[in-house]
Amino acid sequence: MRLRCVAPVASIVLTALLTASAGAQEVKEPRTGVSFPVSRDGMTLLGVGVRTKTFLKVKVYAAAFYVAASALAGPLAAHRGHTTAPAFYRDLVWGDFPKAIVMTFVRDTTASQIRDAFYEALPTIDHARLDLFSSHFGTPQKGQTVVVRWGPGGVIETTSVGNVKPPIADKAFAGAVFGIWLGEKPIQEDLKRDLVARAPEVLRSP
């Protein structure tokens, strides 16, 4: 079921992100207590949030979004001061530069739950492709992390609980995957906003 959450707690996340000291090495997602480093593999943290499901808002995973520092100084710099505009999100989704969604699960999952979540989020994508992608996640348990990374040319690189999976070379699919969180019809509106909450800070003029 696609979830469109209105977020009364969005201001909590924004406050947590923007009040972190300039020298902070981590940012904590306040609703789950999961912390993420502000930099990772040459990429800069743009924001953190939590994926929830059902009207009870059951927490599934804490998420962080990272973008290459070179992209922030390069093509994305044109969006300085306009980080809520659709064009900014389009460039985040489709721009061919390193970026990653990092998910730390806060509850146990099953393979069928992961698969069905992708079926729901990407209803127009071939199920065989989604079966392959979801199989790369395995069955993440509470406290385990899965990373979905955009490689050069639009290659999806998945690392599940430290295990690197075979890449999927398909730029259209890569864009669809990142659109799950950041596209025009995201799985969760407040999560979409939270994942770029640091953008005004990291894109500010020198």
Describe these PLM feature segments.
Residues 29-32, 150-154:
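A short, compositionally biased
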Residues 24-87, 93:
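N-terminal secretory signal peptides
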Residues 190-206:
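Cysteine/selenocysteine-centered motifs that mediate thiol-based redox chemistry or coordinate metal-sulfur cofactors
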